Curated annotation (Swiss-Prot):
Species per Swiss-Prot/TrEMBL record: Plasmodium falciparum (isolate tak 9)
Residue windows of the Sequence repeats: 55-60, 61-68, 69-76, 77-84, 85-92, 93-100, 101-108, 109-113
Disulphide bridges: 259-267
Chain ranges passing through the membrane: none
UniProt-recorded name of the protein: Merozoite surface protein 2
GO BP terms, alphabetized: cell adhesion
Carbohydrate-modified residues: 22, 36, 179, 251, 275-276
Length: 302
């Protein structure tokens, strides 16, 4: 009987020790899981909504970019393009591409042949028609066409001195049409200086001036693209918000701060799981101790 009692007591202690170890492991894992869940919940509550931040950043970027693009582009396209086109006596360009094509090309062609050098036109023979190229897109091409037209006019004036009386009539018609176009230009472009096309001016000085005036229009057409790039502030705000969010990712809630201070009464629902798990572990240990004392008392006194 004594051997049975001793063996039962030894088995009981072994069972109690294993049970306590298992309960402690289970309680520790439960506590760790509950703590991790509470931390995750508090982090989700403390984080700002990332979708709203990204949306506001993109909205600011697209707004600034659209304002710069449409505003400056529309001003440079419609304002400067229309001025260059109508000033040359051609169709007014409505866009930025029409400024270089129709505006500047028509300046070199019509200015060289008709308006700038009418004296050389009077000396030109009817057998040699005026050949001027109007399909120019750059300022260098405009300058080259103007110089070529001047050289041709000068050569015609030297080689054909006899055809003055025959060609003056169409030149007078050209002068009348040019005067009408000048009146229309003055009415349309009041802010710009009108191009002088008098019969007394034999040197084509208006062509380089208009070629130089067409150069800022090309620069103005390229300026909205350059201006719209630094005003796109969407990416900076987007990265700044993410950076500020990543700088302090471990913001704890007020309930966790109060729990760390020791005020367990003010703990939230997330940390109540910790108290429940610790209470369950302590209750299990208490039950094990009571059962151990009862078994020992029966084994000793029986």
């Amino acid at each position: 009987m004594k051997v049975i009692k001793t063996l039962s007591i030894i088995n009981f202690f072994i069972f109690v020790t294993f049970n306590i170890k298992n309960e402690s492991k289970y309680s520790n894992t439960f506590i760790n899981n509950a703590y991790n869940m509470s931390i995750r919940r508090s982090m989700e509550e403390s984080k700002p909504p990332t979708g709203a931040v990204a949306g506001s950043g993109a909205g600011a970027g697209s707004g600034a970019g659209a304002v710069a693009g449409s505003g400056a582009g529309a001003v440079a396209g419609s304002g400067a393009g229309a001025v260059a086109g109508s000033g040359a006596g051609a169709v007014a360009g409505s866009g930025a591409g029409a400024v270089a094509g129709s505006g500047a090309g028509a300046v070199a062609g019509s200015g060289a042949g008709n308006g700038a050098n009418p004296g050389a036109d009077a000396e030109r023979s009817p057998s040699t028609p005026a050949t001027t190229t109007t399909t120019t897109t750059t300022n260098d091409a405009e300058a080259s066409t103007s110089t070529s037209s001047e050289n041709r006019n000068h050569n015609n004036a030297e080689t054909n001195p006899k055809g003055k009386g025959e060609v003056q009539k169409p030149n007078q018609a050209n002068k009348e049409t040019q005067n009408n176009s000048n009146v229309q230009q003055d009415s349309q472009t009041k802010s710009n200086v009108p191009r002088t096309q008098d019969a007394d001016t034999k040197s084509p000085t208006a062509q380089p001036e208009q070629a130089e005036n067409s150069a800022p229009t090309a620069e103005q057409t390229e300026s909205p693209e350059l201006q719209s790039a630094p005003e796109n502030k969407g990416t900076g705000q987007h990265g700044h918000m993410h950076g500020s969010r990543n700088n302090h990712p471990q913001n704890t809630s007020d309930s966790q701060k109060e729990c760390t201070d020791g005020n367990k009464e003010n703990c939230g629902a997330a940390t109540s799981l910790l108290n429940n798990s610790s209470n369950i572990a302590s209750i299990n240990k208490f039950v094990v101790l009571i059962s151990a004392t009862l078994v020992l008392s029966f084994a000793i006194f029986i």
